[in-house]
From Swiss-Prot:
EC number(s) given by UniProt: 7.-.-.-
Alphabetized GO MF terms: 4 iron, 4 sulfur cluster binding; electron transfer activity; metal ion binding
Domain 4Fe-4S positions: 34-92
Family label: Belongs to the 4Fe4S bacterial-type ferredoxin family. RnfB subfamily.
Protein name: Ion-translocating oxidoreductase complex subunit B
Residues the entry annotates as binding [4Fe-4S] cluster 2: C115, C118, C121, C155
Subunit field text: The complex is composed of six subunits: RnfA, RnfB, RnfC, RnfD, RnfE and RnfG.
Protein's cellular compartments: Cell inner membrane
Species per Swiss-Prot/TrEMBL record: Pasteurella multocida (strain Pm70)
């Protein structure tokens, strides 16, 4: 009698699970909300540093705001390049600025003599550009730093400062159109044929 009751309960639970699963599966297909594809495209253009300098909690909410008509010039780490790309995607004219090109990029710098190794800057960095361990010296990886300045306020010793990245021949962004590069062709076989008269 008890075994029959247990089997009945197990079968009833399994049937209910199948029914509710079918209802949820049907609802997920029929009631699916399609994401706005323009939001996804704008979000892909943003630098994904989630720094909040635009006034939004991350890049995805800012992309949604841009799709709803917000200003496209709020992404500081993205600079003029992101503004132009978003304007091109949205089919609008990029806003004119007083600054030619991108502003000078900034990166964080840790004065290692003052660093106490509290790891507060590591926790604040959205792109993991700071390395170090607890109670040990920390340092910045400049190639990863977006200059969002989120690591500066939590530092209890004020050992983090923002410095300009000086353009040198080694780190300058060489912008050129690969279509304009003239290929180098080996003409020695052609010259030999011309000399031999073939």
């Amino acid at each position: 009698m008890i075994i029959t009751t247990v089997y009945f309960i197990l079968v009833a639970i399994a049937v209910l699970a199948l029914i509710f699963g079918a209802i949820l599966g049907f609802a997920s297909v029929k009631l699916k909300v399609e994401a706005d594809p323009i939001v996804e495209k704008i979000d892909a253009l943003l630098p994904q540093s989630q720094c909040g300098q635009c006034g939004y909690p991350g890049c995805k909410p800012y992309a949604e705001a841009i799709a709803n008509g917000d200003d496209i010039t709020k992404c500081i780490p993205g600079g003029q390049t992101v503004i132009v790309n978003i304007a091109e995607l949205m089919g609008v004219e990029p806003p004119t600025t007083d600054i030619e090109g991108d502003p000078a990029p900034m990166v964080a710098f840790i004065d290692e003599d003052m660093c106490i190794g509290c790891t507060k800057c590591i926790q604040a960095c959205p792109v993991d550009a700071i390395i170090g361990t607890n109670k040990a010296m920390h340092t910045i990886i400049p190639d990863l730093c977006t200059g969002c300045e989120l690591c500066v306020p939590p530092c209890p010793t004020d050992c983090i400062s923002m410095i300009k990245v000086e353009s040198t021949i080694h780190n300058w962004n060489w912008k050129f159109d690969p279509k304009l590069v003239i290929p180098i062709v080996d003409t020695t076989t052609t010259q030999k044929k011309l000399i031999k008269g073939e």
